[in-house]
Design a protein with these regions (language model features):
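Short, amphipathic C-terminal "tail helix"
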Residues: 100-173
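Short alpha-helical scaffolding segments that buttress acidic/His motifs in well-ordered protein cores
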Residues: 3, 23-27, 78, 82, ...
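Gly/Pro-rich interdomain helix-loop hinge
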Residues: 10, 17-100, 143-144, 149-152, ...
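Glycine-rich phosphate/pyrophosphate-binding beta-alpha loops
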Residues: 2-19, 114-120
């Protein structure tokens, strides 16, 4: 939801369309095998989104024997529904200029990270993960995949030691 807030604000897309454009990436991100949550909530010891998404697929009568297969069936059903109601497959398909999208991407990513809804997500994203989901939703055809765990070489000192959000820099980018 946080990402849709900013996608709509930066690129003048209706909020429902922005949510629909981000949904597949967010479903994949939230259903990670080894999810991490930086906050604690009494209703769960860790996010159980993959099994919850599988329950949704079961309720809809979708195919699959494993939770992963059910997730893929759920995503296929969501994408089919989006197509039936006229939601285009990618952000780019809405006429958002690539240069403009890329020029605003870092600000949009940071604002999505800081959005009040981010803390309520079952899995707390890194800014680099938000950025990758935006890119995937813009270009289409790629999906969120767990990045390798960072090593010491992936970090550099921040100019401002209080600016912890900008300390992590992916090596080679």
């Amino acid at each position: 939801h946080s990402m849709a807030h900013k996608l709509g604000a930066f690129h003048h897309l209706p909020h429902g369309v922005a949510n629909a454009l981000m949904l597949e990436e967010v479903l994949r991100f939230n259903s990670a095998e080894a999810p991490v949550k930086m906050g604690t909530f009494p209703q769960y010891d860790h996010p159980k989104t993959l099994s919850r998404y599988a329950e949704v697929a079961d309720s809809l009568g979708l195919a699959g024997t494993t939770d992963e297969e059910k997730l893929e069936s759920l995503i296929a059903a969501v994408n089919a529904l989006k197509a039936r109601v006229g939601i285009k497959p990618t952000i780019r398909d809405y006429g958002i200029d690539e240069a403009d999208f890329l020029a605003r991407l870092d600000d949009m990513t940071e604002q999505a990270f800081d959005d009040q809804c981010t803390g309520a997500n079952p899995r707390y994203p890194l800014m680099s993960e938000i950025k990758q989901m935006y890119l995937n939703a813009y270009y289409g055809g790629r999906h969120f995949e767990e990045p390798p765990m960072p090593t010491a070489a992936d970090f550099e000192p921040a100019a401002d030691p209080h600016d912890f959000k900008r300390t992590y820099r992916k090596a080679g980018k």
